[in-house]
Swiss-Prot record:
GO terms for molecular function: acetylcholine receptor inhibitor activity; ion channel regulator activity; toxin activity. Residues 1-21 form the signal peptide. Keywords: Acetylcholine receptor inhibiting toxin, Disulfide bond, Ion channel impairing toxin, Neurotoxin, Postsynaptic neurotoxin, Secreted, Signal, Toxin. This is Long neurotoxin 1. InterPro entries: Snake_3FTx, Snake_toxin-like_sf, Snake_toxin_con_site, Toxin_cobra-type. Gene3D superfamilies: CD59 (2.10.60.10). Binds with high affinity to muscular (alpha-1/CHRNA1) and neuronal (alpha-7/CHRNA7) nicotinic acetylcholine receptor (nAChR) and inhibits acetylcholine from binding to the receptor, thereby impairing neuromuscular and neuronal transmission. It is found in: Secreted. Belongs to the three-finger toxin family. Long-chain subfamily. Type II alpha-neurotoxin sub-subfamily. It comes from the Eukaryota. Expressed by the venom gland. Disulfide bonds join 24-41, 34-62, 47-51, 66-77, 78-83. GO terms for cellular component: extracellular region. It comes from Hydrophis hardwickii (Hardwick's spine-bellied seasnake).
Length: 92
């Protein structure tokens, strides 16, 4: 009986650990596992005072709901692992 109980506990723990979680690129540019409930990746970009010399500021991360678009900001959301890439950056 003890062996059966122990087996059930081990199986439960293994099943809970196998729950799928999204992986997104985060700022700084590296892939990370998203917190529970955050199943979307996003890429937000905008111009600041240095936009003409450095280019747009880019923010990457995980979210539960795609952020609302505000004036001057571009927001893209996606729902596959590491889908919020930046064209000129390389993963390290």
């Amino acid at each position: 009986m003890k062996i059966l109980l122990l087996t059930l506990v081990v199986v439960t723990i293994v099943c809970l650990d196998l729950a799928y979680t999204r992986t997104c690129f985060r700022t700084p540019y590296k892939p990370e596992t998203c917190p529970p409930g955050q199943n979307l990746c996003y890429k937000k970009s905008w111009c600041d005072a240095f936009c003409s010399s450095r280019g747009k500021v880019i923010e990457l991360g995980c979210t539960a709901k795609c952020p609302t678009v505000k004036d001057g900001k571009d927001i893209t959301c996606c729902a596959t692992d590491n889908c919020n890439t930046v064209a000129n950056w390389k993963s390290r």
